[in-house]
Amino acid sequence: MSQEPTTYSLFLFLFLSHGVSSYTVPNSRQDLHPLLQNMAEEIIDGSYLNALLDLIQFQSSHVWTDDLSHRVLAYLNSRNVAFTIPSLQAAVENHLEQRLHQPQKLLEDLRKTDAQQFRTAMKCLLEDKKDGLDLKDIIIDLGEIRERALQSPGVNRSLFLITLERCFQMLNSLECVEILGKVLRGSSGSFLQPDITERLPRDLREDAFKNLSAVFKDLYDKTSAHSQRALYSWMTGILQTSSNATDDSASWVSAEHLWVLGRYMVHLSFEEITKISPIEIGLFISYDNATKQLDMVYDITPELAQAFLERISSSNFNMRNTSTIHRQAHELWALEPFPKMLGLLVCFYNDLELLDATVAQVLLYQMIKCSHLRGFQAGVQKLKAELLDIAMENQTLNETLGSLSDAVVGLTYSQLESLSPEAVHGAISTLNQVSGWAKSQVIILSAKYLAHEKVLSFYNVSQMGALLAGVSTQAFCSMKRKDISQVLRSAVSQYVSDLSPAQQQGILSKMVQAEDTAPGIVEIQGAFFKEVSLFDLRRQPGFNSTVLKDKELGRSQALFLYELLLKTTRRPEELLSAGQLVKGVTCSHIDAMSTDFFLAHFQDFQNNFALLSPYQVNCLAWKYWEVSRLSMPPFLLAALPARYLASVPASQCVPFLISLGKSWLDSLVLDSHKKTSVLRKVQQCLDDSIADEYTVDIMGNLLCHLPAAIIDRGISPRAWATALHGLRDCPDLNPEQKAAVRLKLLGQYGLPQHWTAETTKDLGPFLVLFSGDELSSIATKFPEILLQAASKMARTLPTKEFLWAVFQSVRNSSDKIPSYDPMPGCHGVVAPSSDDIFKLAEANACWALEDLRCMEEDTFIRTVELLGAVQGFSRPQLMTLKEKAIQVWDMPSYWREHHIVSLGRIALALNESELEQLDLSSIDTVASLSWQTEWTPGQAESILQGYLDDSGYSIQDLKSFHLVGLGATLCAINITEIPLIKISEFRVVVARIGTLLCSTHVLAEFKRKAEVVFGDPTEWTSSVLQELGTIAAGLTKAELRMLDKDLMPYFQPSAIKCLPDEIFKELSAEQIASLGPENAAAVTHAQRRRLSPLQLQSLQQALDGAKTHSWQDAPASAGPTRTSSSRSPAGALQSWGLWLGCPLLVLMAKLLW
């Protein structure tokens, strides 16, 4: 892919710079230890890795004295090879850096090492301590070398392969297994391809085999299904060899074998499980760690689980033997030990006949872990429902509530509403730990719990756990501030992120009271801190970098705080090391940094790269280019204008690809044309092909941007398996890439109808690429695998064909029994069942209107929140579901808060008249509606007016949390009423209002209100502009023209999009050029059409990352001094052979003179 740069010129340069060593020692060969003589010969041959290994070996048994360095140099001098200590050090550094970028050559080097050198290399990998070699003149940090090697793309692969090839012949097998574990645990799992098992040793000592099996168990989830099967075969091949089984009727599977297999026991066949001796299975169950093993069989199938349960029941353990179960104590949970031993097998327990209520409760308690299963959740829910019925026999729900575990999430609204406040209060220690609550259930249970409490205090709120989101905004506002403060410092604070924006603002309004702001703000921790308004921050004098370390900052907060603290601190580096504060570093701050300071603290930016905006990255790139382009991390070149990519010589393609592959190109380069240029450079480096798996390792995230042509024809068979493993994780392949992947898969595996279960599992993320006809066979053969694949696509909306295949699969496997008492017009219609709806998730969008209309009322009640979360429902489907809600709950005027909250998107089907009927007196109800973003202006106005009418508030009465809760419906406000909003409430929620995409007229009125808070637009700072968000789109033409061009990058992209076309075109060319890459990418096509040629040129400059600040663009010289040249930088980095892209040098060396 690229040629290794020669080091002759480097050596010559260092030689001339430092001077040739003049040390001479008589009889140097006889006077030098044989290991050091060998090291010197390796240096002469250019085998620096071998030389380093000789040095490490020597140091392990000898003390390095002051004269040894000079003796080594004298020896080299006697061989007519002249080095100084600095030049030798640089040569070794350069060589090792090259090997990090050329891991195939590292593999070759390690193959050529002698036995002693190889053992030394392996021992270095084994060490955990941060050891080093102190050679008096030089300190070599071996710990850093090891860490960098294990983290470098491709190096891990070479270390893995060489360990398999040579280690087991030269070192103790336990040590080799430990090395394999280190290397594999730092990998993506792609090393473990099915054919790798052919290289695994089959004659391991028992302890080494068990340890290596443990490594494979730890990596199970990173391993493909085919590789899991291959590793299982390797493990069982060794286990069967050691088995005492004499014929086919006897099982080779012993208790210890099951323990060794661990998660791999799910690959045992049904027949093998049924042959396991009852004695062995009973012995296995009695092991102390058997439960841990069975708790992790996440991908076990019901059939295999039933087989294991049958063998366990045939052993001396008996689920019904309550005297055995009772053996530890007499309390309810003392019945737990045996069910606990079953691990995830309990999720498939089916011997329910004559089961008593106590054991049913124990089983329910153990079934909490069933959420970890891969699939089969509908069956789990069904089993929980059956156990729930048994657990409540001869008892009321009030009596059993605390002993039903997480099965309580299956209770209907009517069951929850029937609970007494006392029962909920008594069961709170169970209810507060349950996950999976629907929001409507939380509302009901919280109301019951709080009804038992006379005063809302820290103590009773701290008991609520997962039910905290059910506390109303008004209730939070009624609490004392000291109680709120304690809540935010307690364990229950982890649930604050589950609260609605209105609830969070209600809490914030208590913490930040006008008369005493400072203590409240400082006490707010974590992500909640970013909700603090810029206005309140400006009133707080007591911030420092230490106080801010545990707080998440919004960008407007960071901009303000960094500028504030920079004026008062004597150690600006503390601000950069504070993490979140880097969001507030502006281009002017970067420009003002001295060269030494910038280079010394660039690592702080790199450590927090995900927090930086594209504009900040652009500024960092320009700064680095100006002060130290020879050591510039190559990925930063992508932030500069596209022509700068020509600065990457062919010899530096590998570090360029590694550096760029560790970042996400979509967030680094926003302009499609520029991205094309970057990818053209990538293709040039690759020579339009991927030759082997090492190239895949080096590419990292760039794999997701491979052109379709390379995917189709440029990936070699050797590299394809590794590439496919990486492509699985690509979030958004384009249509051409998807088509190319599909063709490759068809070429390799054939049509889906011929696929095995393992193939289907491995290709799960790619099933969406196939047609409905192609998927039909998968839906028939492997319906559960198809469902699992669909569940993992929750972040994206799959194709209609894929969803239809999922739908058909579920419908074909469900009971097709029409209702005994159907609704009128529903005779012969198989209505949706709760199980079907639970399984289908987004594929529920495939229901016909007739199916939804014929849904039974109980089914609707149990699944309404699932249906309300489906993004793909059409307007007619939503209308049908709304009618179903009216049929079940009566007219909207009778609906309570939990009804409205549960509707989700179904509420969008309510017309204006129906919305006016709703009880909208609670801001929490309104907040649940405003969460939807598809309201028509008329609907939004009905919700807003409904809240004002039902609550009795007027516009001037609205508090900050009311404004936040109104959300998008606030855009429906009459502009004549905006001036009535109290400034004291508006100023603390500016950032929230600035997220709304309101009309230009509404934004303009909000902008006028913002002027009261922040002054005239000519006085606005970067932090104010960032805080305002879309409100800034309300600026007039004159105000926009008056803005300093240096403020342009601090508009939010959403504000740029909201600027009317006729106003946007009033920006000067200089202002447009200063927008920055992110804001330039937000410019709409309609806005672009109104621009002049000069403005369009400026826009392209902004998109490309051209310099608009401080220095002039496009310096041509590669030297570190500034230049005013504006020529093309092509070839500017041809002397970039010394680039060391890692934050720390591979060989950490420190000269001590």
UniProtKB/Swiss-Prot annotation:
InterPro entries: Stereocilin-rel. Residues 1109-1128 are annotated as: Disordered. It comes from the Eukaryota. Residues 1131-1153 form a propeptide. A lipid is attached at residue 1130 (GPI-anchor amidated alanine). Keywords: Cell membrane, Deafness, Extracellular matrix, Glycoprotein, GPI-anchor, Hearing, Lipoprotein, Membrane, Non-syndromic deafness, Secreted, Signal. Glycans are attached at residues 156, 211, 244, 289, 321, 394, 398, 460, 544, 812, 911, 974. The keyword Cell membrane applies. It is found in: Apical cell membrane; Secreted, Extracellular space, Extracellular matrix. Disulfide bonds: none annotated. One of its GO terms (cellular component) is cell surface. It is a lipid-anchor; GPI-anchor. The keyword Transmembrane helix does not apply. Residues 1-22 form the signal peptide. Its main location: membrane. One of its GO terms (biological process) is cell-matrix adhesion. Belongs to the stereocilin family. It is linked to Deafness, autosomal recessive, 22: A form of non-syndromic sensorineural hearing loss. Sensorineural deafness results from damage to the neural receptors of the inner ear, the nerve pathways to the brain, or the area of the brain that receives sound information. PANTHER family: OTOANCORIN, STEREOCILIN RELATED. May act as an adhesion molecule. This is Otoancorin. It comes from Homo sapiens. The lineage of its organism: Eukaryota, Metazoa, Chordata, Craniata, Vertebrata. The gene is OTOA.
